[in-house]
Curated annotation (Swiss-Prot):
Purpose of the protein: Involved in oxygen transport from the lung to the various peripheral tissues.
Binding-site list for O2: H60
Family according to the record: Belongs to the globin family.
Highest taxon, organism lineage: Eukaryota
Tissue: Red blood cells.
UniProt xrefs under PROSITE patterns: GLOBIN (PS01033)
Name the UniProt record assigns to this protein: Hemoglobin subunit alpha
Keywords, in A-Z order: Heme, Iron, Metal-binding, Oxygen transport, Transport
Stored PANTHER family: HEMOGLOBIN FAMILY MEMBER, HEMOGLOBIN SUBUNIT ALPHA
GO cellular component, one term: haptoglobin-hemoglobin complex
Alphabetical GO biological process terms: hydrogen peroxide catabolic process
Length: 143
């Protein structure tokens, strides 16, 4: 598994300063891209309107990005921070672990699009590593 360096952590925190307070907008767009591009992801929300601009999409986007904001706030103890979320996704929601990397890709796209001046090669690499670590921890309870 990737290990986040001090520089990675600083890069992630610097970018996340621009995400904080806008979790629903960033999350809505990232989830919207995933739901549009990957039809089977709709199965987790059979009774929800997942169209662009829907309340359900904004609400869940805010939850996802809020969880990532919490992870950034506790970046030095990600395993303990994400244990409940991991349990929930593995045992209650039973989300296919293959969906996590897909969402991570869409989050990278959204951050890069909205924060181009901040999204240098090094920052992109740090965010990618952070998302990889968080996603691996979120699927760790699937065993």
């Amino acid at each position: 598994m990737f290990k986040l360096s001090g520089e990675d952590k600083a890069n992630v925190k610097a970018v996340w300063d621009h995400v904080k307070g806008h979790e629903d907008a960033f999350g809505h767009e990232a989830l919207g891209r995933m739901f549009t591009g990957i039809e089977q992801t709709h199965t987790y929300f059979p009774d929800k309107d997942l169209n662009e601009g829907s309340f359900a999409l904004h609400s869940h986007g805010k939850k996802v990005m809020g969880a990532l904001s919490n992870a950034v706030a506790h970046i030095d103890d990600l395993e303990a921070t994400l244990v409940k979320l991991s349990d929930k996704h593995a045992h209650d929601l039973m989300v296919d672990p293959a969906e996590f990397p897909r969402l991570a890709e869409d989050i990278l796209v959204v951050l890069g699009f909205h924060l181009p001046a901040k999204f240098t090669y090094a920052v992109q690499c740090s965010i990618d590593k952070f998302l990889h670590v968080t996603m691996r921890l979120c699927i760790s309870k699937y065993r």
